């Protein structure tokens, strides 16, 4: 069941508090996202030279890629204050007003999950971002009056995993959109090696590579796996983490060589054995796995699609040859029309 915490989930878990010590503090320490990093450095340097607030920044990308870390680094590089909140926490316009009126000149306000702001809060945010003013309605009925409050010039840094849910007026007010992509194994190796140094644990190159290969392109997962592998190394009184120790630890955690866990393999195996590799509708899979549809679509499937194990077709979910090879199963012969664009809607 997906309510059991998964070792390889990119979402933040309660036990991830330990990863704060692994976060880079400066852009120079940040590994990966080379183009985004280079552009941010230029924008930050320019704003600092002009002694102006940085234009509003929007970070877009899957969970665990460093959106929050980059927001903190932006404030640190600018030498200004940093306030953090999230879309669901700002329930009403007054909550947003309280945050904005307490900002100093050029401060950074970070709103995670900004796509989850309510329409009423968004309406208040528009003039704040554009004109650095708050337009509030005080009172009700005939006694209601409009109040305009001047704000310090600030930088709003928004983060979202679902850019498509942002309204156009909100999206258009961000002068610096930054898309974050999954990390390469080489980049994750550097992140794991740096994390090992921070945690004061020995790490061989092949040990770092083994953890990086199973981290699903996501630094948050790499840090989580590193902390758990360190536990296995400590229990075995090992002087450092090598490939053998990492392989044993990750095997015990049921994270295989491709970064798939027990839930991923159960999903793929169900389609392979029960439905001949597909196509099979998502509602059928939800019933077969006793999982809600949104958990399958948002939690299980994205990585499988990204790695080429799964296709979403109009007729349903379909396993690829790559998936059968990974499972060690023989791929059945299938009608080529199953891969077509027509022939029925997916459930």
From Swiss-Prot:
It is found in: Cytoplasm. Residues 1-183 are annotated as: Large ATPase domain (RuvB-L). CDD domains: AAA (cd00009). GO terms for biological process: DNA recombination; DNA repair. Residues 184-254 are annotated as: Small ATPAse domain (RuvB-S). InterPro entries: AAA+_ATPase, AAA_lid_4, DNA_helicase_Holl-junc_RuvB, P-loop_NTPase, RuvB-like_N, RuvB_C, WH-like_DNA-bd_sf, WH_DNA-bd_sf. It is an enzyme of class 3 (hydrolase). Its main location: cytoplasm. Its EC number is 3.6.4.-. Keywords: ATP-binding, Cytoplasm, DNA damage, DNA recombination, DNA repair, DNA-binding, Hydrolase, Nucleotide-binding. DNA binds at residues 293, 312, 317. It catalyses: ATP + H2O = ADP + phosphate + H(+). Residues 257-347 are annotated as: Head domain (RuvB-H). Mg(2+) binds at residue 68. GO terms for molecular function: ATP binding; ATP hydrolysis activity; four-way junction DNA binding; four-way junction helicase activity. GO terms for cellular component: cytoplasm; Holliday junction resolvase complex. ATP binds at residues 22-23, 64, 67-69, 130-132, 173, 183, 220. The RuvA-RuvB-RuvC complex processes Holliday junction (HJ) DNA during genetic recombination and DNA repair, while the RuvA-RuvB complex plays an important role in the rescue of blocked DNA replication forks via replication fork reversal (RFR). RuvA specifically binds to HJ cruciform DNA, conferring on it an open structure. The RuvB hexamer acts as an ATP-dependent pump, pulling dsDNA into and through the RuvAB complex. RuvB forms 2 homohexamers on either side of HJ DNA bound by 1 or 2 RuvA tetramers; 4 subunits per hexamer contact DNA at a time. Has 3 domains, the large (RuvB-L) and small ATPase (RuvB-S) domains and the C-terminal head (RuvB-H) domain. The head domain binds DNA, while the ATPase domains jointly bind ATP, ADP or are empty depending on the state of the subunit in the translocation cycle. During a single DNA translocation step the structure of each domain remains the same, but their relative positions change. Homohexamer. Forms an RuvA(8)-RuvB(12)-Holliday junction (HJ) complex. HJ DNA is sandwiched between 2 RuvA tetramers; dsDNA enters through RuvA and exits via RuvB. An RuvB hexamer assembles on each DNA strand where it exits the tetramer. Each RuvB hexamer is contacted by two RuvA subunits (via domain III) on 2 adjacent RuvB subunits; this complex drives branch migration. In the full resolvosome a probable DNA-RuvA(4)-RuvB(12)-RuvC(2) complex forms which resolves the HJ. Belongs to the RuvB family. PANTHER family: HOLLIDAY JUNCTION BRANCH MIGRATION COMPLEX SUBUNIT RUVB (PTHR42848:SF1), PTHR42848. This is Holliday junction branch migration complex subunit RuvB. The lineage of its organism: Bacteria, Pseudomonadati, Pseudomonadota, Alphaproteobacteria, Hyphomicrobiales. The gene is ruvB.
